[in-house]
């Protein structure tokens, strides 16, 4: 039975994670997803993880990460305890530790995973899209867990303003920082004041590229510090 306990009360504060980059979100979310959908292959090898990150379906946005970018993200997530490298295999394999780090049940982890994989969604969309990870009894069950996640300290999700013409509000996860909210252009705005969809897409692509570079540089810094015996904590 789905039950979000104490959904009406603010939960005790937990240690806040730093904001995760897009590639870091994608890596941990793919690990959660594949744990349920391809359990025979879980924990995942780097190659399988890369394929899941670059998957063309059920992903928003679609990315084209390199093996080195995914490995750098894995190294960073290991430092945050969100990913664990499993020993005892010829090939390195990885599993997630999302529920333990965030202190959330499997139902909430499924919701966060779909929000990281597919972007903001309504409660109804989340119920349909989480089917393979967790089967919620009804939409109100999803809403209960969303409310509980929103009441965390710091919050893990946020309810977005309802877009003009939309019947339901969408929810976004906050592990990647505050979501980008589209705002309707004011009436009478000049064409040169409007930003085209292509320009927005280009800016987001540039942002994602820079995030990946930061992750790689951070991983290289930690490796260098380890070699020199320097503590960066």
Swiss-Prot record:
Coiled-coil portions: none
InterPro entries according to UniProt: DUF480, WH-like_DNA-bd_sf, WH_DNA-bd_sf
Transmembrane regions listed in the UniProt entry: none
Family to which this protein belongs: Belongs to the UPF0502 family.
Protein name per the record: UPF0502 protein Mpe_A1449
Species per Swiss-Prot/TrEMBL record: Methylibium petroleiphilum (strain ATCC BAA-1232 / LMG 22953 / PM1)
């Amino acid at each position: 039975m789905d039950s979000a306990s104490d959904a009406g009360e603010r939960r005790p504060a937990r240690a806040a994670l730093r904001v995760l980059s897009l590639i870091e979100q994608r890596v941990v979310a793919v690990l959660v997803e594949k744990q349920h959908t391809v359990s025979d292959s879980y924990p995942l090898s780097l190659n399988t993880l890369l394929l899941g990150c670059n998957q063309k379906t059920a992903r928003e946005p679609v990315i084209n990460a390199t093996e080195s970018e995914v490995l750098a993200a894995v190294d960073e997530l290991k430092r945050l305890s969100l990913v664990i490298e499993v020993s005892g295999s010829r090939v390195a394999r990885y599993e997630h530790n999302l529920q333990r780090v965030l202190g959330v049940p499997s139902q909430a982890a499924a919701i966060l995973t779909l929000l990281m994989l597919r972007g903001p969604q309504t409660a109804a969309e989340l119920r349909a899209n989480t089917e393979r990870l967790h089967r919620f009894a009804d939409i109100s069950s999803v809403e209960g867990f969303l409310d509980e996640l929103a009441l965390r300290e710091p919050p893990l999700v946020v309810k977005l303003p309802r877009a003009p013409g939309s019947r339901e509000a969408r929810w976004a996860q906050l592990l990647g920082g505050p979501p980008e909210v589209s705002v309707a252009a004011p009436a009478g705005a000049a064409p040169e004041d409007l930003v085209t969809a292509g320009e927005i897409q280009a800016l987001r692509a540039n942002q994602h590229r820079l995030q990946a570079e930061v992750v790689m540089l951070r991983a290289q810094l930690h490796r260098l510090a380890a070699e020199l015996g320097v503590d960066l904590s």
